[in-house]
Amino acid sequence: MLKDIFLFWGSLFGYDHTAIYIFHFLLVVAITMFIAVAVTKSMRLVPRGLQNIIEAYLSGVIALGKDAMGSEKLARKYMPLIATIGFIVFLSNIIGLIPGFEAPTASLNLTLSLTLCVFFYYHFEGIREKGFIKYFAGFCGPVKAIAPFMFVIEVISHLSRIISLSFRLFGNIKGDDLFLLVMLTLAPVLVPMIPYALLSFMAILQAFIFMVLSYVYLAGAVVVDEEH
């Protein structure tokens, strides 16, 4: 019965969770692409409707990046990546609140994939902005005597970001899904409205945190010390 409530699409895949997550992620990507095409197809000088909402969202992402990186120019430069990932994370989170659907971000495979995209991209940008030697020399710190030790610490610190960013999103959304499943099973239909509101807020919050940390990691990679 529980599977019938939350895994409506599971009947198409034999309750193969990997296939279910992939299906819902492709659905999220399709929705994202549809919205992007719908907004850009008929853009107006004075935005209204969906264009107004998307422009407000992008302005918010730029403001977020400016606070995180200390530069509006850099915030705008990386806005397409951060805004796209943030939107996909939000949709992936929120779709899990619909009975019969499952949040793609409740799969560690997706959260790890998104994290690796950010991880490799900010290192790529750091190397491109500072050069290979200068970028990794920054891992050694200002004191030459302990440079090898600091380098190892920095490498471990950067690798730990993969675990913290991916597991934070995965753990929170998976927990939210299980909580909602229990509430819908034990309580009447109207009672879970408060948990729905709370979980909707958590879906937004987790997407926000993912975007903030992505901007912070990019700032640490590309912002030169003199610019602080």
Curated annotation (Swiss-Prot):
Asked whether the UniProt record includes Amino-acid biosynthesis among its keywords, one would answer no
Recorded GO CC terms:
plasma membrane; proton-transporting ATP synthase complex
What is this protein identified as? ATP synthase subunit a
Q: Which Pfam families match?
A: ATP-synt_A
Which Gene Ontology MF annotations are present? proton-transporting ATP synthase activity, rotational mechanism
Q: Which GO terms describe its biological process?
A: proton motive force-driven plasma membrane ATP synthesis
The answer to whether keyword Transmembrane helix applies is yes
Family to which the UniProt record says this protein belongs: Belongs to the ATPase A chain family.
- Record membrane topology: Multi-pass membrane protein
Keywords assigned by UniProt? Answer: ATP synthesis, Cell inner membrane, Cell membrane, CF(0), Hydrogen ion transport, Ion transport, Membrane, Transmembrane, Transmembrane helix, Transport
Q: State what this protein does.
A: Key component of the proton channel; it plays a direct role in the translocation of protons across the membrane.
Q: Where are the transmembrane segments?
A: 19-39, 81-101, 107-127, 136-156, 178-198, 204-224
Classification via Gene3D superfamilies: ATP synthase, F0 complex, subunit A
Please give the organism: Campylobacter hominis (strain ATCC BAA-381 / DSM 21671 / CCUG 45161 / LMG 19568 / NCTC 13146 / CH001A)
Question: Which subcellular locations apply to this protein?
Answer: Cell inner membrane
Q: Which domain of life is it from?
A: Bacteria
Q: Which NCBIfam families match?
A: ATP_synt_6_or_A, PRK05815.2-3
Family annotation (InterPro entries): ATP_syn_F0_a_bact/chloroplast, ATP_synth_F0_asu, ATP_synth_F0_asu_AS, F0_ATP_A_sf
* Assembly, per entry: F-type ATPases have 2 components, CF(1) - the catalytic core - and CF(0) - the membrane proton channel. CF(1) has five subunits: alpha(3), beta(3), gamma(1), delta(1), epsilon(1). CF(0) has three main subunits: a(1), b(2) and c(9-12). The alpha and beta chains form an alternating ring which encloses part of the gamma chain. CF(1) is attached to CF(0) by a central stalk formed by the gamma and epsilon chains, while a peripheral stalk is formed by the delta and b chains.
